[in-house]
């Protein structure tokens, strides 16, 4: 006789088998999970559901793989508005991006700069709104086409309104479980891919250009694992873009992970702590900024390896570097032991002295730092994105070639900022013209301008507001209305507004009126 417990065990074993079979499919087999199928089966949802997110993710995956194989790229921009999303489809874009920064400026009760301090469901809600509008546009287009004769239908334009949505997951908004809840909401909203970064929340000081802080490598991987686990629990094909914001970071929250130790800065002179120096400056009326700069100069901040180099003879340093090259990562204590072994003089190094009032450690990342984090994260996601707000071609090239040395077929993303002066950074006009295609050859198959909505629309709004203010309705008709009517810009057409679709709904629902006896 089969008991309820026996049935439960059989269902569990069947689910484990189904999960393992799913993980063996081409897309899923690339992911290396630190947990088992049995763990997922224990945590999985009891009521099974299929999420449109999976359909969109598979569509996106095939699109990106095709571009990656051809050495080309698909380009898009950041949107938070359903109307703009529909225009991306009309323009022939293949994806759209929902930026957390733009949502934080436009879709919340209390706007703010890019601290990711808005509610965790802000971006999922924006995705949900856009995805619903995409479905509506696809439906009303289908209905309009099918009301026409076959020959006439062939002449009608047809747009792909169901563009896959890539969305900003920021840093996951807190603990593992809050990250998983956010991920669940994203999947339910219809997103095709989300990205998660390695930043610490709310520590940037924008006006002085300081404060970019990353979390330890282990915490970054824990965030990504939480997202992947939630995808698996929901049986979702949703893609994960592993974004690394370590480039130009100044601080790290913790030194718990030996993989980060090579890049942590310490004082190499025996002085008071930075916090004490700043307190003394405050009490005497000295500028905190100047006091900080003075302390950093006196502390002679270096990484431990730099401190070794400044202390050792050339031969001693050569022996030290040879010793630490025998394995990928050495903790600070291992480095200190090797320094004691190979150097005749003591190396003074204290990474506690420079710690900030927020507890941050000074950090000195290099392109190699970003490469190491990206390689560590790659098994958990389908794509990699190294955020470079101040990109230099040699750094872009070095990063992507460094990761491809380990993962030759890796797909990459890249985001362009809205205020970076490419000319001042040494890019010629010809280099800038070819930048998109040159990066595509490095495997960067998805490229985005996240701040499009702010920069382009703000500029257009000011330009046309000035015309309206100066020339009134005459200016509007001449500069907006007449060109829009000539160019078939969406706005009030019966088809785009869904009037035919609405009338069809009314007609279908009113079919029973024919049965009313008169």
From Swiss-Prot:
Principal localization reads: mitochondrion
Task: Identify which top EC class this enzyme belongs to.
Answer: lyase
* One of the record's GO cellular component terms: cytosol
Reactions the enzyme catalyzes: (2S,3R)-3-hydroxybutane-1,2,3-tricarboxylate = pyruvate + succinate
**Could you mention a single GO BP entry for this protein?**
threonine catabolic process
Instruction: Indicate the family of this protein.
Output: Belongs to the isocitrate lyase/PEP mutase superfamily. Isocitrate lyase family.
Function summary: Catalyzes the formation of pyruvate and succinate from 2-methylisocitrate during the metabolism of endogenous propionyl-CoA. Does not act on isocitrate.
The protein here is known as Mitochondrial 2-methylisocitrate lyase
Q: Which gene encodes it?
A: icl2
């Amino acid at each position: 006789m089969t008991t309820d417990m026996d049935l439960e065990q059989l269902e569990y074993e069947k689910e484990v088998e189904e999960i393992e079979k799913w993980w063996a499919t081409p897309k899923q087999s690339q992911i290396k999970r630190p947990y088992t199928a049995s763990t997922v089966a224990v945590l999985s949802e009891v009521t099974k559901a299929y999420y449109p997110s999976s359909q969109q993710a598979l569509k996106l995956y095939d699109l990106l793989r095709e571009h990656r194989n051809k050495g080309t790229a698909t380009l898009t921009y950041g949107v938070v508005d359903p109307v703009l999303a529909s225009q991306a489809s009309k323009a022939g874009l293949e994806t759209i991006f929902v930026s957390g920064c733009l949502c934080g400026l436009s879709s919340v009760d209390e706007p703010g700069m890019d601290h990711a301090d808005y509610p965790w469901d802000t971006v999922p809600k924006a995705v949900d709104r856009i995805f619903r509008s995409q479905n509506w546009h696809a439906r009303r287009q289908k209905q309009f086409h099918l009301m026409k004769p076959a020959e006439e239908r062939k002449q009608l334009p047809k747009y792909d309104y169901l563009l896959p949505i890539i969305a900003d997951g920021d840093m996951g908004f807190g603990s593992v479980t809050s990250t998983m809840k956010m991920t669940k909401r994203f999947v339910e909203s219809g997103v095709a891919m989300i990205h998660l970064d390695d930043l610490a929340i709310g520590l940037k000081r924008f006006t002085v250009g300081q404060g970019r802080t990353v979390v330890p490598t282990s915490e970054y991987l824990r965030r990504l694992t939480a997202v992947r686990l939630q995808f698996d629990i929901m049986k979702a094909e949703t893609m994960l873009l592993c974004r690394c914001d370590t480039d130009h970071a100044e601080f790290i929250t913790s030194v718990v992970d030996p993989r980060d130790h090579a890049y942590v800065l310490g004082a190499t002179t025996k002085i008071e702590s930075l916090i004490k120096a700043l307190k003394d400056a405050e009490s005497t009326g000295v500028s905190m900024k100047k006091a900080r700069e003075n302390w950093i100069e006196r502390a002679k901040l270096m990484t431990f390896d730099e401190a070794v180099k400044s202390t050792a003879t050339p031969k001693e340093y050569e022996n030290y570097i040879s010793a630490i090259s025998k394995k990928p990562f050495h903790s600070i204590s291992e480095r200190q032991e090797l320094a004691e072994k190979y150097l005749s003089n003591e190396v003074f190094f204290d990474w506690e002295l420079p710690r900030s009032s927020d507890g941050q450690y000074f950090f000195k990342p290099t392109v190699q730092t970003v490469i190491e984090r990206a390689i560590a994260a790659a098994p958990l996601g389908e794509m990699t994105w190294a955020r470079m707000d101040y990109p230099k071609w040699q750094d872009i090239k070095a990063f992507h070639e460094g990761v491809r040395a380990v993962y030759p077929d890796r797909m990459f993303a890249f985001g362009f900022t809205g205020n970076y002066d490419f000319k001042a950074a040494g890019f010629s006009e010809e280099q800038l013209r070819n930048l998109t295609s040159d990066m595509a050859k490095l495997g960067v198959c998805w490229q985005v301008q996240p701040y499009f909505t702010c920069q382009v629309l703000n500029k257009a709004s000011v330009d046309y507001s000035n015309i309206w203010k100066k020339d009134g309705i005459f200016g509007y008709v001449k500069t907006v209305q007449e060109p829009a009517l000539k160019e078939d810009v969406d706005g009030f057409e019966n088809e785009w507004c869904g009037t035919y679709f609405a009338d069809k709904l009314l007609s279908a629902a009113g079919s029973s009126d024919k049965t009313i006896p008169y």
